[in-house]
Amino acid sequence: MSVEAGCSTLSNPLKKLTSTAVVNNSTPSAQYRKHLTKSQSRTYAPLQTLSEDQFTSFKNLQGNNSPLGNVVKNPVSLKTGNHTGTTTRGGSKENWVHSFSSLQQQNSKSAWTSEFSEVFLNSSENDRFRNLNQPLKQSFFGSAGLNLSSNTEIPLQSSLAIDETELAKKFEEASQISNKLEKEKDATGSKSIEELWEEHQKQLKNAGLEPASLEEYQKQWEDFLKSNNISDDPYTSSVNSFANDNLAHNKNIDPQIFQHSDTDNVVENSLQTEDVYSQNQDESSEVVKELNGIDPFVEAMNLIKNGGSISKAAVLLEQSVKENPQHFEAWKWLGRIHTLLGNESRVVEALLEAVKLDSTNLDLMMDLAVSYVNQSLNVQALVCLEDWIVNSFPQYRNRFAKINERFEEKDSANDLLKMQMYFLDVAYELSLAKKRSSKVQAGLGIIMYMLKEYERSADCFRQALQDEPSNEILWNKLGAALTNAEKNTEAVSSYNRAVSLQPQYVRVRSNMAVSNINLGYFEDAAKHLLAAIDIIQNSSTSMESCESNEELWEMLRKVFLIGFQSTDLASQSYPGANTSYIRAQLSDLQGWPGVELE
């Protein structure tokens, strides 16, 4: 299993610079898709005799004044001259048999069960059931016999006479079968996903197929979801849907979990995947409402300077760029804050807006390169790195030209090696002049990371940290490189340095969780994930639906499912849930102490 912290935590198998991947494990299944879907909140075990659509249609046929199949709006009427008889079971058995016998004459088949199956076939293959206002025609039953119009009388007797007693007997037998199927459905259909999974685990155990590793456990879970036609991610449905439907049927869900004050807003926000930040702020953020004429950018900078909530600062900066789209500093800081929060897509958007306003700010190009790497957009990342190195060291343009001659063929592999030569050459020239640049070392570290040379990447970041020991972002990059180099203990030390410099660095906490998962410390992983969620999920902001929050919850569910093998805790973990309640549940389960934000 591969787990990545931050952007696209579980859906993207590629390793990322400011995020890390669980090592010594296989690539994650594509089952865990990134976008939100409304999934079923309740899963029924499949019926073995009839499909669910057939079963529903048959039950409707039995009911009083019920149409055949869910798509039919009105009961079927048989027009015979001036008389209309409705094909329902509302009248006597004799009347029903009489009407059915009349219908049967239109069909070349005499067996009731055969005709019943053919009606289901037609109902599933076409939409003619929707047009029952039209005169009933023979083609409706898929047979090439008479073609009836609304004024054609249906003969009440036929050469293919049916034994009405036998027909009634068959109908009664079918009714008994239907009732039995309904009871079986009630017995199995009300089971939650967790209960079905527990039963499946018992079956695997009895068959001697218990998982020997976390990877096997994960694969069995995904196979179970697929075989039961359960949504890839059954817990990412909107909170209100989960509360109204799942809570009614799942005894494992405690109502206290819905105590979070902003639960009502999450439903609408979770469906807005584009421009989610700017759309949410003006209607749901108390932070903006409380400004009372104060410049939101000034207030945001005060929060950042004094160690206030960075999620609140993000909301204020979003408001600032909304009021003044030409505010360069607001866009620049918005990109930096979302870097801390782990919202890569918004980082790119903000930095691109800043570059439009000031293309001479080369530091933005380096930051953009990192974000592109995190989104596996290596071509764009290389463009940013080349722009940075060429414009930062114009005195070496002739040297860059000579390097270009060695890489005439244009492809991504050559471009990456060419950029490596650019940065190595500059680093060498600086060393000859007894100089060094932390930016050059950081850029070289990014390139080594893209080449998957993680130990060399870590060496570059260590060199950069000699000049910038208080740069929490560099410490996080060092930790990411070490994690992917399978040096998780060293990585945790780097992450701890980053957290000590910026306690609200969400990406660091999620990366720390990954290293703890690699080390088998699932309690610590859960602790850091919950702490990261608390930073984002502030009841006074509308950040609950941002991408990093959704990904943190997704990773937390995996920790509970795979590390703790607790489907109960996993089912209670989704954006908007009450983290204090989950901590209490976890404490009861493991004797694990609650965690305060550092």
UniProtKB/Swiss-Prot annotation:
Coiled coil: none
Superkingdom, taxonomy of origin: Eukaryota
GO biological process, one term: protein import into peroxisome matrix, docking
Gene3D superfamilies: Tetratricopeptide repeat domain
Sites bearing Phosphoserine, chain numbering: 66
Keyword Iron-sulfur: no
Predominant location category: cytoplasm
PROSITE patterns (alphabetical): TPR (PS50005), TPR_REGION (PS50293)
Pfam families named among the record's database cross-references: TPR_16
Region entry Amphipathic helix 1 (AH1), spans: 8-30
SMART domains (alphabetical): TPR
Domain notes: The TPR repeats mediate interaction with proteins containing a C-terminal PTS1-type tripeptide peroxisomal targeting signal (SKL-type).
Family indicated by similarity: Belongs to the peroxisomal targeting signal receptor family.
Name the UniProt record assigns to this protein: Peroxisomal targeting signal receptor
Organism per entry: Schizosaccharomyces pombe (strain 972 / ATCC 24843)
Gene that encodes it: pex5
